[in-house]
């Protein structure tokens, strides 16, 4: 049975600087809720596209080979599998991320040039 969830109410319960957890599964994909301030490591997903949907705040997504994307509330961006990227935020940001349940994350040790 499905259950209704208020995403911002769930996010408001998060007190940590960084939290990322699954809130739902749709077929072979998971929907994750992230609440964070700061930056995540450079990485890529060799086997899954990744969809970001910002609910609150401002999410910066840096890429190895193109300009930084700036997403605000109600903006979304699809990142194709294999694309090296990282997320950053200078203010508390709440976003959804949709990706394959078994998506692999490959951390890049050095910042790409």
Swiss-Prot record:
Pfam families the record matches: Cupin_2 (PF07883)
Entries under InterPro entries matching the protein: Cupin_2, Germin_Mn-BS, PKS_Associated_Protein, RmlC-like_jellyroll, RmlC_Cupin_sf
GO MF, one annotated term: manganese ion binding
Domain Cupin type-2, residue spans: 41-88
Family statement: Belongs to the SchB/CurC family.
Protein name, as recorded: Uncharacterized protein YdbB
Organism: Bacillus subtilis (strain 168)
Gene (name only): ydbB
């Amino acid at each position: 049975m499905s259950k209704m969830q208020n995403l911002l109410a769930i996010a408001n319960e998060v007190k940590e600087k960084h939290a990322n957890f699954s809130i739902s599964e749709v077929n072979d994909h998971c929907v994750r809720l992230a609440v964070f301030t700061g930056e995540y490591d450079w990485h890529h997903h060799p086997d899954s596209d990744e969809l970001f949907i910002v609910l609150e705040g401002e999410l910066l997504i840096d890429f190895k080979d193109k300009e930084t994307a700036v997403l605000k509330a109600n903006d979304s961006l699809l990142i194709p599998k294999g694309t090296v990227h990282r997320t950053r935020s200078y203010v508390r940001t709440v976003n959804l991320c949709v990706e394959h349940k078994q998506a692999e994350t490959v951390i890049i040790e050095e910042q790409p040039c």
